[in-house]
Every structure is written in structure tokens, then in C-alpha cells.
């Protein structure tokens, strides 16, 4: 069974609203007999009435975040925990996302032969760490390579239990870089991408059936769409009548309106 995994920590309403919207879009794709939705949270009681399996991560947040130094570290640590606990494939989804038709079929097919990530981002992703070296538990000596180092976006992370050693190495690399996390907040996805590169693990991208709207303008637009189209009742998981579409001019127009109203509101 494929386990879809969401993460909620910190208790911020805007992020929980994004999770709700994404999860509702995912539900429309799934046969409950063939897939499970997991929600990992430091406030598990929030999800007690949802048709999901809840993972209580409150006891782990401090350790998984490197003592609070880098909260993005929780993501690979959580994927590792879910793989170990369920001994089945796990597909982590960032909450700022919309699942589109065909996603489950695409994910199921691609995860049979590859690790799934959202999309390729760039070569030589962190030039200032040129010369960085560390030792990883499975791969051994690592050196940042300006010619070959790369990074994929980790809005999706799809892995199977046999990939656990890859996560051990990813977490070790993150820990070696954690002192630079404030300057380079993407080290979580960089570390996993590098371990996949060095182990020559196949990577499959999913971006047509998975919309990841992490950029600022699109996120502001989506906050308004979620507010307008979902029930304010937390446990009401009724889908919106129409799913949000990321049309460029609609996003620009709403952000202009949003900016003007904020400025005017400051003078009232």
C-alpha cells in the first residue's frame, strides 16, 4: 500500500488550511483500499475526526529539527520514521500543493523504479559551500562538486523501505551543514538530491499532476482561494466546486488588490 504523508507542526492556521486543501484534492484521487493518508503532527488531536492515520510527532520535533536549529530537517527524518514504521512505500507531499487528476496513477507507476521528487531545480545549487567536505555513514567521504552537484525540489519525496540508507546519509549531510541553515534553508532538499546522485538512484519528477505553489505571490493568491472555497468548519472536507487554477494574470491582479487594500487598511 502506498502511504501519502503530510506534515503539520507549529500550529499555524494558514499552513493547516493549505494542508486541508491539498489533502481534499488528494482524496479525490484515491481508492482507500489501495492507499493510506498519514498526517504527522505535534497536535494530533486536531485531526482526530479526519479519515486519516495520525502520527504524533510532538516527542520528536526537537530532536528531528536538530535541537530547533533547522526545522526543515523534520521532513527527511519523518519520511525515515514512516518508512520504518509501516514498511511500505511513502510519498511525502508539501502542504502548499494541489493534486490533479492522474497523480495517484503517475506516482504509483514511477515509484516502482525510482525515488520521486517534484522537479529538477539547478546544477551547482549552493556555490558558497565550494570545498565543503564531510563523511557520510554509508557513502563515506563526500565533497561538494561545482561541476556535478545538483538539487531537486523536495515538494514531493517518494521512497520505499530499501531507501532508508539514503535518508541516513541525507540526515548526516544536513547535520554537517546545519550551522549554515539560516543562510541556505534549502540544504534539506540539496542533501537528499546529492545522495541520490552519488548512489546513482533513479529520480522521477512529478509536476504536471502535482502543483506546488510555494512561491510568495502564488501562496498569497491561494490563501484567498482557500478562504473563499472551503468550509470554515475544520472537519468539513467537502471539495470546492472548482479547483484553483494558477492563471498568471489572476495571480497578478489579486496580489495588486491585496497590496493596495493592505496599504489603505493601514491608514484606517
Regions found by a protein language model. Name each.
Residues 99-135:
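Conserved donor-nucleotide/metal-binding helix-loop-beta segment in metal-dependent transferases, i.e.
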Residues 21, 62-91, 101:
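A conserved donor-nucleotide-binding helix/loop in the catalytic core
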Residues 207-268:
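C-terminal catalytic/acceptor-binding lobe
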Residues 94-98:
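The conserved acidic donor/metal-binding loop of glycosyltransferases
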Amino acid at each position: 500500500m502506498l502511504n501519502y504523508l503530510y506534515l503539520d507542526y507549529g500550529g499555524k492556521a494558514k499552513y493547516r488550511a493549505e494542508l486541508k486543501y491539498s489533502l481534499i484534492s488528494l482524496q479525490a484521487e484515491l481508492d482507500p483500499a489501495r492507499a493510506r493518508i498519514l498526517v504527522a503532527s505535534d497536535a494530533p488531536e486536531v485531526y482526530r475526526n479526519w479519515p486519516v492515520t495520525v502520527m504524533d510527532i510532538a516527542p520528536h520535533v526537537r530532536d528531528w529539527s536538530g535541537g530547533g536549529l533547522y526545522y526543515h530537517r523534520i521532513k527527511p527524518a519523518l519520511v525515515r520514521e514512516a518508512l520504518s514504521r509501516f514498511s511500505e512505500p511513502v510519498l511525502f507531499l508539501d502542504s502548499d500543493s494541489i493534486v490533479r487528476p492522474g497523480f495517484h496513477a503517475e506516482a504509483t507507476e514511477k515509484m516502482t523504479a525510482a525515488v520521486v521528487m517534484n522537479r529538477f531545480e539547478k546544477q551547482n545549487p549552493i556555490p558558497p559551500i565550494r570545498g565543503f567536505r564531510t563523511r557520510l555513514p554509508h557513502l563515506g567521504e563526500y565533497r561538494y562538486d561545482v561541476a556535478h552537484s545538483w538539487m531537486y525540489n523536495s515538494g514531493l519525496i517518494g521512497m520505499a523501505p530499501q531507501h532508508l540508507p539514503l535518508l541516513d546519509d541525507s540526515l548526516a549531510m544536513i547535520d554537517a551543514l546545519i550551522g549554515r541553515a539560516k543562510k541556505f534553508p534549502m540544504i534539506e532538499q540539496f542533501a537528499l538530491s546529492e545522495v541520490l546522485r552519488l548512489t546513482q538512484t533513479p529520480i522521477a519528477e512529478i509536476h504536471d499532476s502535482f502543483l506546488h505553489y510555494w512561491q510568495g505571490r502564488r501562496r498569497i493568491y491561494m490563501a484567498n482561494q482557500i478562504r473563499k472555497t472551503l468550509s470554515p468548519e475544520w472537519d468539513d472536507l467537502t471539495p470546492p466546486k472548482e479547483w484553483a487554477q494558477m492563471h498568471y494574470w489572476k495571480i497578478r491582479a489579486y496580489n495588486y488588490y491585496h497590496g493596495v487594500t493592505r496599504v489603505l487598511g493601514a491608514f484606517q
